[in-house]
């Protein structure tokens, strides 16, 4: 029977569909273990300003402080000329990932401007995050990511790329 018939005889409330739509919201995910995120973020207009010892030191310093400031543990990272890749995991009292990323970009931007006399926008607003699923491992993703400088023709082997490292171990 059409919905109009049920509505006309009072079996279905006319606002039923709207009420259901308002109640059917996406539920928050519940994790047994805290997930590991793979993050990629790019410089504004993809300017190649990151691959230097000075910038690498600033980024690594701020990643080291992320645990105390924001409750995020940073694992391995690769700094490319115009983007960075890193892995991270939240602690129990961590700030939201978007809040952490916004703050990290602000802190690194301020330090790059102050310490390196850089003017202009450092980062794009957005970032890419991917939760590592059970079918993919941290080490497999890391092996792929650390080959980026090789694929970009910057070095012959991944071990030659000097702007990579690990802040804390995320291995389970």
Predicted features along the sequence, with ranges:
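Short catalytic/metal-binding and nucleic-acid-binding patches
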Residues: 1-172
């Amino acid at each position: 029977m059409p919905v109009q018939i049920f509505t006309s005889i009072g079996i279905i409330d006319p606002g039923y569909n709207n009420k259901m739509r308002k109640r059917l919201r996406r539920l928050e995910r519940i994790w047994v273990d805290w997930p590991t995120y793979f993050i990629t973020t790019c410089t504004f207009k993809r300017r190649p300003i990151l691959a230097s010892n000075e910038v690498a030191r600033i980024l690594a310093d701020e990643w080291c402080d992320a645990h105390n400031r924001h409750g995020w543990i940073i694992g391995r990272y690769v700094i490319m000329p115009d983007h960075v890749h890193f892995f991270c995991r939240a602690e129990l009292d961590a700030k939201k990932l978007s809040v952490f990323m916004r703050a990290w970009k602000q802190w690194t931007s301020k330090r790059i401007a102050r310490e390196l006399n850089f003017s202009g926008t450092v980062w794009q607003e957005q970032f890419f995050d991917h939760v590592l699923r059970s079918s993919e491992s941290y080490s497999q993703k890391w092996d792929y990511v650390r080959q980026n400088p090789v694929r970009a023709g910057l070095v012959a082997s991944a071990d030659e790329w000097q702007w990579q490292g690990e802040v804390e171990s995320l291995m389970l």
